[in-house]
Amino acid sequence: MKRWMTIWATLLLAVVGQGQDIHFSQVDADPVLLNPAYSGFYEGVGRFGMVYRNQWASVSIPYQTLAVSGEMALWRGAGRKGLSVGMTVFNDHAGTLHYGTTSGHLSIAYYQPLNRAGTSILSVGLEGGFAQSGFDPSQAEMEDPSESFTVQTVRYGLLAAGVAWYWQAMSDLHAKVGFSVRNINRPNISYMQLDDTHLERRYSMFARAEFRKWQSISLLPVVLWQHQGKHSELVYGADLKWYIEEDGAREVSLRAGLAFRHADAIIANLMMEYGAFLFTFSYDANVSGLSVASGGIGAFEGGMVYRFTSGSKKTKRIKCPQY
Protein backbone atom coordinates (compact mmCIF):
# COMPACT_ATOMS: atom_id res chain seq x y z
CA MET A 1 0.00 0.00 0.00
CA LYS A 2 2.86 2.35 0.81
CA ARG A 3 4.39 1.71 -2.60
CA TRP A 4 1.02 2.33 -4.25
CA MET A 5 0.68 5.68 -2.50
CA THR A 6 4.20 6.64 -3.56
CA ILE A 7 3.39 5.94 -7.19
CA TRP A 8 0.18 7.94 -6.97
CA ALA A 9 2.11 10.82 -5.44
CA THR A 10 4.51 10.66 -8.37
CA LEU A 11 1.59 10.80 -10.79
CA LEU A 12 0.06 13.71 -8.94
CA LEU A 13 3.33 15.61 -9.28
CA ALA A 14 3.34 14.74 -12.97
CA VAL A 15 -0.17 16.10 -13.38
CA VAL A 16 0.85 19.30 -11.63
CA GLY A 17 3.77 19.56 -14.03
CA GLN A 18 1.46 18.82 -16.91
CA GLY A 19 -0.70 21.69 -15.70
CA GLN A 20 1.94 23.86 -17.33
CA ASP A 21 2.11 23.55 -21.12
CA ILE A 22 5.09 22.28 -23.07
CA HIS A 23 7.37 25.21 -23.84
CA PHE A 24 10.88 25.84 -25.13
CA SER A 25 13.70 28.22 -24.29
CA GLN A 26 14.13 28.96 -28.00
CA VAL A 27 11.09 31.21 -27.84
CA ASP A 28 11.04 32.08 -31.54
CA ALA A 29 13.08 29.39 -33.30
CA ASP A 30 9.74 28.13 -34.64
CA PRO A 31 7.18 30.78 -33.62
CA VAL A 32 4.00 28.88 -34.58
CA LEU A 33 4.70 26.77 -31.46
CA LEU A 34 4.13 29.95 -29.47
CA ASN A 35 1.23 31.62 -31.29
CA PRO A 36 -1.00 30.27 -34.10
CA ALA A 37 -1.15 33.78 -35.57
CA TYR A 38 2.55 33.50 -36.47
CA SER A 39 1.73 30.95 -39.16
CA GLY A 40 2.68 32.78 -42.34
CA PHE A 41 5.15 35.23 -40.73
CA TYR A 42 8.08 34.13 -42.89
CA GLU A 43 9.59 34.61 -46.34
CA GLY A 44 8.68 31.92 -48.88
CA VAL A 45 5.71 29.62 -49.41
CA GLY A 46 6.18 27.15 -46.56
CA ARG A 47 8.23 26.15 -43.56
CA PHE A 48 9.16 22.95 -41.74
CA GLY A 49 10.82 22.83 -38.32
CA MET A 50 11.67 20.63 -35.37
CA VAL A 51 12.95 21.30 -31.84
CA TYR A 52 14.30 18.79 -29.30
CA ARG A 53 14.67 19.56 -25.58
CA ASN A 54 16.47 17.48 -22.94
CA GLN A 55 15.77 18.83 -19.44
CA TRP A 56 17.43 17.95 -16.11
CA ALA A 57 20.01 15.61 -17.63
CA SER A 58 21.49 15.08 -14.15
CA VAL A 59 18.56 12.81 -13.19
CA SER A 60 18.48 9.16 -14.25
CA ILE A 61 15.66 9.57 -16.79
CA PRO A 62 15.47 13.23 -17.89
CA TYR A 63 12.47 15.05 -19.30
CA GLN A 64 12.63 14.92 -23.10
CA THR A 65 10.45 16.90 -25.50
CA LEU A 66 10.19 16.85 -29.29
CA ALA A 67 8.12 19.19 -31.45
CA VAL A 68 7.70 18.96 -35.22
CA SER A 69 5.80 21.60 -37.19
CA GLY A 70 4.98 22.51 -40.76
CA GLU A 71 3.30 25.49 -42.41
CA MET A 72 2.25 26.43 -45.92
CA ALA A 73 0.57 29.35 -47.64
CA LEU A 74 -2.91 28.46 -48.90
CA TRP A 75 -3.61 31.75 -50.62
CA ARG A 76 -2.00 35.12 -51.14
CA GLY A 77 -3.88 38.10 -52.45
CA ALA A 78 -3.11 41.65 -53.41
CA GLY A 79 -1.36 43.89 -50.93
CA ARG A 80 0.33 40.99 -49.12
CA LYS A 81 -2.84 39.62 -47.59
CA GLY A 82 -3.09 35.86 -47.31
CA LEU A 83 -4.11 32.66 -45.58
CA SER A 84 -1.73 30.10 -44.06
CA VAL A 85 -2.22 26.72 -42.37
CA GLY A 86 0.04 24.81 -40.01
CA MET A 87 0.36 21.48 -38.21
CA THR A 88 2.31 20.71 -35.03
CA VAL A 89 3.03 17.45 -33.19
CA PHE A 90 4.43 17.37 -29.62
CA ASN A 91 5.77 14.48 -27.57
CA ASP A 92 7.34 14.57 -24.12
CA HIS A 93 8.12 11.84 -21.59
CA ALA A 94 10.13 11.23 -18.42
CA GLY A 95 10.56 8.99 -15.40
CA THR A 96 10.62 5.26 -14.75
CA LEU A 97 6.87 5.07 -15.42
CA HIS A 98 7.44 6.62 -18.88
CA TYR A 99 4.90 9.31 -18.11
CA GLY A 100 4.33 11.42 -21.20
CA THR A 101 2.05 13.39 -23.47
CA THR A 102 1.55 13.31 -27.23
CA SER A 103 -0.51 15.95 -29.00
CA GLY A 104 -1.32 17.09 -32.52
CA HIS A 105 -2.54 20.56 -33.54
CA LEU A 106 -3.91 22.19 -36.70
CA SER A 107 -3.79 25.97 -37.09
CA ILE A 108 -4.97 28.55 -39.59
CA ALA A 109 -3.99 32.21 -39.81
CA TYR A 110 -5.21 35.13 -41.90
CA TYR A 111 -2.98 38.16 -42.35
CA GLN A 112 -4.17 41.55 -43.54
CA PRO A 113 -2.00 44.59 -44.40
CA LEU A 114 -2.97 47.78 -42.61
CA ASN A 115 -1.42 50.15 -45.16
CA ARG A 116 -0.76 50.22 -48.90
CA ALA A 117 2.97 49.71 -48.51
CA GLY A 118 2.43 46.48 -46.59
CA THR A 119 4.82 47.58 -43.86
CA SER A 120 2.16 47.02 -41.17
CA ILE A 121 0.40 43.64 -41.11
CA LEU A 122 -2.16 42.21 -38.69
CA SER A 123 -2.56 38.44 -38.35
CA VAL A 124 -5.26 36.42 -36.57
CA GLY A 125 -4.85 32.70 -35.90
CA LEU A 126 -6.93 29.80 -34.57
CA GLU A 127 -5.79 26.35 -33.50
CA GLY A 128 -7.43 23.08 -32.52
CA GLY A 129 -5.73 19.97 -31.21
CA PHE A 130 -6.02 16.62 -29.48
CA ALA A 131 -3.75 15.27 -26.72
CA GLN A 132 -3.20 11.97 -24.93
CA SER A 133 -1.31 11.58 -21.65
CA GLY A 134 -0.46 8.34 -19.95
CA PHE A 135 2.08 6.10 -18.23
CA ASP A 136 3.25 2.48 -18.32
CA PRO A 137 1.83 0.59 -15.28
CA SER A 138 4.03 -2.43 -16.05
CA GLN A 139 7.01 -0.41 -14.79
CA ALA A 140 5.38 0.02 -11.35
CA GLU A 141 6.40 -2.32 -8.53
CA MET A 142 3.38 -3.04 -6.34
CA GLU A 143 3.62 -4.56 -2.86
CA ASP A 144 0.14 -6.02 -3.35
CA PRO A 145 -0.22 -7.63 -6.84
CA SER A 146 -4.01 -7.19 -6.61
CA GLU A 147 -3.64 -3.40 -6.65
CA SER A 148 -4.05 -1.76 -10.05
CA PHE A 149 -4.68 1.59 -11.67
CA THR A 150 -8.20 2.37 -12.85
CA VAL A 151 -7.14 5.14 -15.25
CA GLN A 152 -3.88 4.94 -17.19
CA THR A 153 -4.59 7.30 -20.09
CA VAL A 154 -6.43 10.60 -20.43
CA ARG A 155 -7.47 12.17 -23.73
CA TYR A 156 -8.65 15.71 -24.30
CA GLY A 157 -9.13 18.41 -26.93
CA LEU A 158 -7.35 21.76 -27.01
CA LEU A 159 -8.30 25.16 -28.42
CA ALA A 160 -6.08 28.21 -28.94
CA ALA A 161 -6.27 31.64 -30.57
CA GLY A 162 -3.83 34.45 -31.18
CA VAL A 163 -3.23 37.80 -32.81
CA ALA A 164 0.05 39.26 -34.09
CA TRP A 165 1.25 42.51 -35.60
CA TYR A 166 4.27 43.07 -37.83
CA TRP A 167 5.68 46.56 -38.36
CA GLN A 168 8.55 47.81 -40.51
CA ALA A 169 9.53 51.40 -39.81
CA MET A 170 12.43 51.46 -42.25
CA SER A 171 14.81 49.05 -43.95
CA ASP A 172 16.92 48.69 -40.81
CA LEU A 173 14.14 48.52 -38.18
CA HIS A 174 11.26 46.05 -37.95
CA ALA A 175 9.40 44.29 -35.15
CA LYS A 176 6.62 41.85 -34.35
CA VAL A 177 4.32 41.66 -31.34
CA GLY A 178 1.85 38.91 -30.49
CA PHE A 179 -0.70 37.77 -27.92
CA SER A 180 -2.20 34.29 -27.64
CA VAL A 181 -4.44 32.20 -25.38
CA ARG A 182 -4.08 28.42 -25.20
CA ASN A 183 -6.28 25.79 -23.52
CA ILE A 184 -9.31 28.02 -23.98
CA ASN A 185 -11.58 25.06 -23.18
CA ARG A 186 -9.69 24.14 -19.93
CA PRO A 187 -9.79 20.33 -20.43
CA ASN A 188 -9.88 17.89 -17.51
CA ILE A 189 -6.52 16.06 -17.26
CA SER A 190 -7.08 14.11 -14.02
CA TYR A 191 -6.15 10.41 -13.70
CA MET A 192 -8.55 9.97 -10.80
CA GLN A 193 -12.23 9.29 -11.29
CA LEU A 194 -14.69 11.84 -9.92
CA ASP A 195 -11.91 14.44 -9.81
CA ASP A 196 -11.45 17.59 -11.87
CA THR A 197 -7.91 18.79 -12.56
CA HIS A 198 -8.08 21.26 -15.41
CA LEU A 199 -5.32 22.37 -17.74
CA GLU A 200 -5.44 26.10 -17.14
CA ARG A 201 -5.47 28.71 -19.87
CA ARG A 202 -2.05 29.99 -20.87
CA TYR A 203 -1.74 33.67 -21.80
CA SER A 204 1.34 34.69 -23.77
CA MET A 205 2.70 38.04 -24.92
CA PHE A 206 5.75 38.14 -27.15
CA ALA A 207 7.79 40.91 -28.79
CA ARG A 208 10.88 40.70 -30.99
CA ALA A 209 12.60 43.52 -32.90
CA GLU A 210 15.61 43.83 -35.16
CA PHE A 211 17.73 46.98 -35.30
CA ARG A 212 20.38 47.14 -38.03
CA LYS A 213 23.06 48.87 -35.96
CA TRP A 214 26.02 48.47 -38.29
CA GLN A 215 26.42 47.49 -41.94
CA SER A 216 26.48 43.75 -41.26
CA ILE A 217 25.40 43.45 -37.60
CA SER A 218 21.92 43.67 -36.07
CA LEU A 219 20.65 43.80 -32.50
CA LEU A 220 17.56 41.68 -31.74
CA PRO A 221 15.97 42.30 -28.30
CA VAL A 222 13.19 39.94 -27.16
CA VAL A 223 10.60 39.80 -24.37
CA LEU A 224 8.23 36.91 -23.57
CA TRP A 225 5.65 36.89 -20.77
CA GLN A 226 3.44 33.89 -20.02
CA HIS A 227 0.88 33.20 -17.30
CA GLN A 228 -0.87 29.91 -16.58
CA GLY A 229 -2.83 29.21 -13.41
CA LYS A 230 -0.59 30.17 -10.49
CA HIS A 231 2.55 30.20 -12.62
CA SER A 232 4.14 33.10 -14.48
CA GLU A 233 7.22 33.29 -16.68
CA LEU A 234 9.18 36.30 -17.89
CA VAL A 235 11.99 35.89 -20.42
CA TYR A 236 14.03 38.83 -21.69
CA GLY A 237 17.30 39.18 -23.54
CA ALA A 238 18.97 40.09 -26.82
CA ASP A 239 20.92 38.54 -29.69
CA LEU A 240 23.55 39.90 -32.04
CA LYS A 241 23.23 38.79 -35.66
CA TRP A 242 26.14 38.91 -38.10
CA TYR A 243 25.21 38.88 -41.80
CA ILE A 244 28.10 37.05 -43.46
CA GLU A 245 26.49 37.00 -46.89
CA GLU A 246 23.29 38.60 -48.16
CA ASP A 247 22.29 37.35 -51.58
CA GLY A 248 18.60 36.41 -51.57
CA ALA A 249 18.14 32.68 -50.92
CA ARG A 250 21.88 32.32 -50.23
CA GLU A 251 21.82 34.43 -47.07
CA VAL A 252 24.35 33.26 -44.50
CA SER A 253 24.36 34.59 -40.94
CA LEU A 254 25.39 33.78 -37.38
CA ARG A 255 23.43 34.80 -34.31
CA ALA A 256 24.32 34.55 -30.62
CA GLY A 257 22.83 35.96 -27.46
CA LEU A 258 21.78 35.65 -23.85
CA ALA A 259 18.33 35.62 -22.29
CA PHE A 260 17.13 35.41 -18.71
CA ARG A 261 14.15 33.47 -17.43
CA HIS A 262 13.44 35.66 -14.43
CA ALA A 263 14.52 34.08 -11.11
CA ASP A 264 15.02 30.72 -12.82
CA ALA A 265 17.66 30.36 -15.53
CA ILE A 266 20.20 31.94 -17.86
CA ILE A 267 19.76 30.92 -21.49
CA ALA A 268 22.58 30.96 -24.05
CA ASN A 269 21.49 30.92 -27.71
CA LEU A 270 23.37 30.19 -30.92
CA MET A 271 21.82 30.14 -34.41
CA MET A 272 23.19 29.72 -37.92
CA GLU A 273 21.28 30.55 -41.08
CA TYR A 274 22.48 29.08 -44.35
CA GLY A 275 20.20 29.74 -47.30
CA ALA A 276 16.82 28.18 -46.55
CA PHE A 277 18.12 26.37 -43.44
CA LEU A 278 18.24 27.63 -39.87
CA PHE A 279 20.07 25.61 -37.20
CA THR A 280 19.53 26.48 -33.53
CA PHE A 281 21.13 25.58 -30.22
CA SER A 282 20.46 26.76 -26.67
CA TYR A 283 21.38 25.80 -23.14
CA ASP A 284 19.68 26.65 -19.82
CA ALA A 285 21.70 27.03 -16.63
CA ASN A 286 19.62 26.94 -13.44
CA VAL A 287 20.06 29.85 -11.04
CA SER A 288 16.99 29.15 -8.87
CA GLY A 289 16.73 26.91 -5.81
CA LEU A 290 16.37 23.95 -8.18
CA SER A 291 20.06 24.27 -9.03
CA VAL A 292 20.94 22.42 -5.80
CA ALA A 293 19.04 19.31 -6.92
CA SER A 294 19.99 19.57 -10.60
CA GLY A 295 23.63 20.48 -10.03
CA GLY A 296 23.04 23.64 -12.05
CA ILE A 297 22.28 21.55 -15.13
CA GLY A 298 19.19 22.85 -16.85
CA ALA A 299 18.15 22.00 -20.40
CA PHE A 300 19.71 21.55 -23.81
CA GLU A 301 17.77 22.38 -26.98
CA GLY A 302 18.60 21.82 -30.62
CA GLY A 303 16.47 22.63 -33.63
CA MET A 304 16.27 23.03 -37.38
CA VAL A 305 13.98 25.07 -39.63
CA TYR A 306 13.71 24.89 -43.41
CA ARG A 307 11.89 27.55 -45.44
CA PHE A 308 10.49 26.67 -48.85
CA THR A 309 10.91 29.39 -51.48
CA SER A 310 9.27 29.59 -54.90
CA GLY A 311 11.78 31.82 -56.64
CA SER A 312 8.94 34.13 -57.65
CA LYS A 313 9.11 37.73 -56.49
CA LYS A 314 5.32 37.76 -56.25
CA THR A 315 5.36 35.34 -53.34
CA LYS A 316 8.08 37.02 -51.34
CA ARG A 317 6.89 38.51 -48.09
CA ILE A 318 8.31 41.58 -46.42
CA LYS A 319 11.43 40.80 -44.45
CA CYS A 320 10.43 39.62 -40.98
CA PRO A 321 12.84 39.08 -38.08
CA GLN A 322 14.28 35.67 -38.88
CA TYR A 323 13.87 32.73 -36.51
Positions of predicted regions on the chain:
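Sec-dependent N-terminal signal peptides
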Residues: W4-V15
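Subset of outer-membrane beta-barrel
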Residues: Q20-Y323
